[in-house]
Amino acid sequence: MSVRGRVAPSQTPSRIPGTVLAYLALTKPRVIELLLVTAIPAMLLAQRGTVNPLLIVNTLIGGMLAAGGANALNCVADADIDKVMKRTARRPLARAAVPTRNALVFGLVLTAGSFLWLWWTTNLLSGLLALATIAFYVFIYTLLLKRRTSQNVVWGGAAGCMPVMIGWSAVTGTIQWPALVMFAIIFFWTPPHTWALAMRYKDDYKAAGVPMLPAVATERQVTKQIVVYTWLTVLATLALALATGWLYAAVALVAGVWFLAMAHQLYAGVRAGEPVKPLRLFLQSNNYLAVVFCALAIDSAIGLPHLF
């Protein structure tokens, strides 16, 4: 037997984990965390108490398939700019760890799987919402808006709001006003969250030709917009208190004051010409959303009486 014949079998297993991890990276697992943080509380609020655990699991599986499919297709569409940006240069397609055709097929399979799974285990509305989310994220945000307008994340962020709609519809089979308010919370939260990160990597966006707001506007203009959307976020969280108990309302109020203070602090620092740390707001905005929706989950699971 030749040396090549003896070495090849031992090399094959070592390549498998890397390939699996590359496909997993296409789904952007960190982005999927938003699904877990928001969908479960939405389901609990819809029921105002306990929800069948199997329904939660099935909804999360369908949601993860949908998010993974959307993210994989996004990676295919953005492969050219991912190669240019330092922050994304290690993504699978940017470093040719996965063939583009395979990534496209992978994304389409996950997309079809999400629709079929949600239709089979929950209801048709949830499956259709998942399909609509993927289509919006890929065609409207990634292909149409992202490279054409500085308001890309404002409108494109609607895709990230859909887990609450899917979670609510999985329980009720309908869409009601609390689901729309939760949609608004995430919709308004997305711009300050994303722009804070983009302030840190604005040179990357400039190099890639992506007109993210921090890449085309002054820091003062950006932070002013961050403050505006932070206020809208907090007001939306307080509006949701009309459908919750006192625990959620109290946490939303305290967390909202804290989030607003951070946004205003960033704006004040820029106005004063001081060095600022926008990445801190980006990281803490994750904590803010998690705290608010965890409070919503607990409030709903306990079944506290409505404030109003």
Swiss-Prot record:
Membrane topology (UniProt): Multi-pass membrane protein
Classification via CDD domains: PT_UbiA_Cox10
GO biological process, one term: heme O biosynthetic process
Family annotation (NCBIfam families): cyoE_ctaB, PRK04375.1-2
Role description: Converts heme B (protoheme IX) to heme O by substitution of the vinyl group on carbon 2 of heme B porphyrin ring with a hydroxyethyl farnesyl side group.
Main location: membrane
UniProt miscellaneous comment: Carbon 2 of the heme B porphyrin ring is defined according to the Fischer nomenclature.
InterPro entries the UniProt entry points to: Protohaem_IX_farnesylTrfase (IPR006369), UbiA_prenyltransferase (IPR000537), UbiA_sf (IPR044878)
Encoding gene, per UniProt annotation: ctaB
Protein's UniProt name: Protoheme IX farnesyltransferase
Keyword annotations from UniProtKB, A to Z: Cell membrane, Heme biosynthesis, Membrane, Transferase, Transmembrane, Transmembrane helix
Pathway: Porphyrin-containing compound metabolism; heme O biosynthesis; heme O from protoheme: step 1/1
Classification via Gene3D superfamilies: UbiA prenyltransferase
Pfam families hit by this protein: UbiA
